[in-house]
């Protein structure tokens, strides 16, 4: 069975500040690069946006996806926190509204539509896919900050 391999990264210059996200998708010999930029955003918003944009371009729901991110916020959120947030009406353990709720809700829908296995990868560790996603995010930020 073929798998789609996805690497995502998000970054921010200032927090909040100018942010960018990058995605590198691989499926067999095919690869696709995506990137985007946003003003007045946060690093966590860009990390979430990268994963959302990656999953939005996948049209088939029956292909396994390995998604790699260096964001522990995204990994822990999607694999642990989100179940409790939903059970508590999108509130945290402290009964406060979940930050970035719009992004988390969109990611939750996409995650449930696809067969995603989530992987954490250490950032800036020489991982080719993570380095590519990071470079795409930085190129996006370069476009707006120059």
Curated annotation (Swiss-Prot):
It comes from the Bacteria. Keywords: Cytoplasm, Endonuclease, Hydrolase, Magnesium, Metal-binding, Nuclease. Pfam families: RNase_H. It is an enzyme of class 3 (hydrolase). Its main location: cytoplasm. GO terms for molecular function: magnesium ion binding; nucleic acid binding; RNA-DNA hybrid ribonuclease activity. InterPro entries: RNase_H, RNaseH-like_sf, RNaseH_domain, RNaseH_sf, RNaseHI. The keyword Hydrolase applies. It catalyses: Endonucleolytic cleavage to 5'-phosphomonoester. The keyword Nuclease applies. Mg(2+) 2 binds at residues 9, 134. It is found in: Cytoplasm. Its cofactor is Mg(2+). Its EC number is 3.1.26.4. Mg(2+) 1 binds at residues 9, 47, 70. Binds 1 Mg(2+) ion per subunit. May bind a second metal ion at a regulatory site, or after substrate binding. One of its GO terms (cellular component) is cytoplasm. GO terms for biological process: DNA replication, removal of RNA primer. Residues 1-142 form the RNase H type-1 domain. Endonuclease that specifically degrades the RNA of RNA-DNA hybrids. Monomer. NCBIfam families: PRK00203.1. Belongs to the RNase H family. This is Ribonuclease H. It comes from Ruthia magnifica subsp. Calyptogena magnifica.
